[in-house]
Amino acid sequence: MKRVINSCIAVLLGVAVMSAVIVLCSENPSVSLAAFFLKPFSTRGYIRALFHKAGLFVCMALGASCALKTGMINLGGDGQIYAAGFVTALLLREYWGVGFLLQWSVALLCALSVAGILACVSGILKAWLATSEMITSFLLSTACVPLIDALIITVTRDPAGNLLATAPVHSHFILQQQTSLFGVPAVLTYASLVALAVGCFFSYTRVGYQFRICGKAPEFGRFVGFPVWATYVWGMVLSGALFGLTGFFSVVGLFGTCYVGFSVGMGYAALAHALIAHAHITVLVPLAFFFAWMETASEAAVLGAHLTVNVVLFLQAAIFLLISAQWSAPWNAVRRGARRVYRFLVTVFCFRGEKHRTRRRHALSVHDTHHRRSRWE
């Protein structure tokens, strides 16, 4: 319950901060607020883009949540998504003549492998040298981004004249026009199935149980004989592979190409998403629609209402600042104070005679028993 309260307060305050920024930075606040809150649902194209972004947010949040469940924090999401998208664009820009499904599967496997290897380096350094995975993953991501930028601009630039993107993906590999059950975009459907598989892995498999135990209590994991070092490595590999899946779906689903800097901010958005959900897989999918709505609404406000500030950044900042606050602490202090006042009143008014003393002891024992029971429940 405390986690739910903290998450709800962080989200509400983040939305309030974004609304305040829109009012302060816009020349016409009413038009900007209307564009922010209503325009994402105004047309079918906006709704379709919202569903596509929700699928990407599910994959991103799964990557961040898998790292959190194993006791790690993967800050290299931007670089891992970027590398996977770049590899996908290179492998799918032309048809090889071996079957579309086979080529699509090879590109997917390569994208997952590249991102998983980048994350695996941080896991190995954590397991063998006890280095911080946050620092190593962030540094590797920071090193990969300018390297891929240079490759896109020089070697793999679109020969048709686009200076900031690779050649577009072959039309047969694009998921943008593909739909699945009830008209839901294919990206969101595939991402939901992946979320279901990851949730079953952590909840109903022996290896997933070991991952969760070693992530929460590594000393206990070592005591019972679990390979904690393997948890670090494979947890980061799984996190990187899911970030790579995000890059793959970004190229074949939403963008159709790999352009310079398309993954900027995705890693931190995924971390904010996972922190709000407290790494609960079942919460990630519905929460993805909220984050997709926020990003779509911010773009609509910037384009339609001439807003010069990307307010999604303020949402992420508010979440990072507020998610760690213990908002239930004041309520617990009030409960403790009320309990002390109750004990004082019982002591004052039940002091005369053996009958009153017995009644006082009984009242205090019943109150303490109820408090202990409610505390454990």
From Swiss-Prot:
Transmembrane segments: 4-24, 49-69, 72-92, 98-118, 135-155, 182-202, 223-245, 249-268, 274-294, 303-323
Keyword flag Cell membrane: yes
Record keywords: Cell inner membrane, Cell membrane, Membrane, Transmembrane, Transmembrane helix, Transport
Role this protein plays: Probably part of the ABC transporter complex RfuABCD involved in riboflavin import. Probably responsible for the translocation of the substrate across the membrane.
GO cellular component, one term: plasma membrane
Family recorded in the similarity comment: Belongs to the binding-protein-dependent transport system permease family.
Short name of any one Pfam family annotated for the protein: BPD_transp_2
InterPro entries xrefs: ABC_transp_permease
Subunit text: The complex is probably composed of two ATP-binding proteins (RfuB), two transmembrane proteins (RfuC and RfuD) and a solute-binding protein (RfuA).
Protein name: Probable riboflavin import permease protein RfuC
Annotated organism of origin: Treponema pallidum (strain Nichols)
Molecular function terms from GO: transmembrane transporter activity
Membrane-protein topology: Multi-pass membrane protein
